Amino acid sequence: MPGVYLEDSDNFEIALRRFKKQVEKAGVLSELKKRQHYEKPSVQRKKKKAAARKRLIKKMRKMSMG
């Protein structure tokens, strides 16, 4: 779990920025969005396959251009 410890000389804006970076790096917000609603395992598999297909198409397009 992300956390930032403040000292007396620390600026709040800087600490908030550090905290936001830690939250983003830990993936807290993306996990929260993913868990907002229940998703059936079959739907999860479909999304995972679609994402893999999309990555493959992107990779193939990049290879053909470069």
Swiss-Prot record:
Gene3D superfamilies the UniProt entry points to: Ribosomal protein S8
Database matches in InterPro entries: Ribosomal_bS21 (IPR001911), Ribosomal_bS21_CS (IPR018278), Ribosomal_bS21_sf (IPR038380)
Record key words, sorted: Ribonucleoprotein, Ribosomal protein
GO molecular function, one term: structural constituent of ribosome
A Pfam family that the UniProt record links to this protein: Ribosomal_S21
Example of a GO biological process term: translation
Keyword S-adenosyl-L-methionine appears in the UniProt entry: no
PANTHER family: MITOCHONDRIAL 28S RIBOSOMAL PROTEIN S21, SMALL RIBOSOMAL SUBUNIT PROTEIN BS21
Membership in a protein family: Belongs to the bacterial ribosomal protein bS21 family.
Protein name in UniProt: Small ribosomal subunit protein bS21
Organism: Maridesulfovibrio salexigens (strain ATCC 14822 / DSM 2638 / NCIMB 8403 / VKM B-1763)
